[in-house]
């Protein structure tokens, strides 16, 4: 269920959101990043992902979000669970009036680049980086870098 913008703003203002992040790896061990067009994290390079909707199973969310973010519908079994993560942002989808808090379920995926049909609705451009390049990238968001940080727990929390 998608909410009207006013209702969604009330939810974001008062509760954490649940989302899925996809750590997509190609055959060369590079990770897919997209440059975000929207708040929060606008302008930063970020792994693909998105929110789970109310009354949506994780299986349905995974299939919907892989289609929306990668251009290919994948089953939950295609991913390897990579832990629970916390993302905090000073802004939100519409303004800087209030913060956004996500509880994120990370999933690692190996996908052939030729299978992807990367859409432009959420990301202006895409690139593949090695984990080392990703960690060194100034404009790679800290929440995406955290998936590869040597200081990060092995599985999120």
UniProtKB/Swiss-Prot annotation:
GO molecular function: GDP-mannose mannosyl hydrolase activity; magnesium ion binding; manganese ion binding
Binding-site residues for substrate, renumbered to this chain: 2-3, 8, 36
Cofactor(s) the record lists: Mg(2+)
Protein's gene: gmm
Cofactor note: Binds 1 Mg(2+) ion per subunit.
Coiled coil: none
Name of the molecule in the record: GDP-mannose mannosyl hydrolase
Oligomer status and interactors: Homodimer.
Enzyme Commission number(s) from the entry: 3.6.1.-
Source organism (scientific name): Salmonella typhi
Ranges where the Nudix hydrolase domain occurs: 3-153
Catalyzed reactions per annotation: GDP-alpha-D-mannose + H2O = D-mannose + GDP + H(+)
Motif (Nudix box): 50-71
PANTHER family cross-referenced by the UniProt entry: GDP-MANNOSE MANNOSYL HYDROLASE
NCBIfam families in the record: PRK15434.1
UniProt record similarity statement: Belongs to the Nudix hydrolase family.
């Amino acid at each position: 269920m998608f909410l009207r913008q006013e209702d969604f703003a009330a939810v974001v203002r008062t509760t954490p959101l649940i989302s899925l992040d996809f750590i997509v790896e190609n055959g060369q061990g590079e990770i897919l990043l997209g440059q975000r067009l929207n708040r929060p994290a606008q302008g930063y390079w970020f792994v693909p992902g998105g929110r789970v909707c109310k009354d949506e199973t994780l299986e349905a969310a995974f299939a919907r979000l892989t289609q929306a973010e990668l251009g290919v519908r994948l089953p939950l079994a295609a991913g390897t669970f990579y832990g629970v993560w916390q993302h905090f942002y000073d802004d939100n989808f519409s303004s800087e009036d209030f913060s956004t808090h996500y509880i994120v379920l990370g999933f690692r995926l190996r996908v052939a680049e030729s299978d992807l049909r990367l859409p432009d609705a959420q990301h202006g451009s895409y690139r593949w980086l090695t984990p080392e390049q990703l960690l060194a990238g100034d404009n790679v968001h800290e929440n995406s870098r955290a998936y590869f940080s040597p200081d990060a727990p092995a599985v999120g929390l």
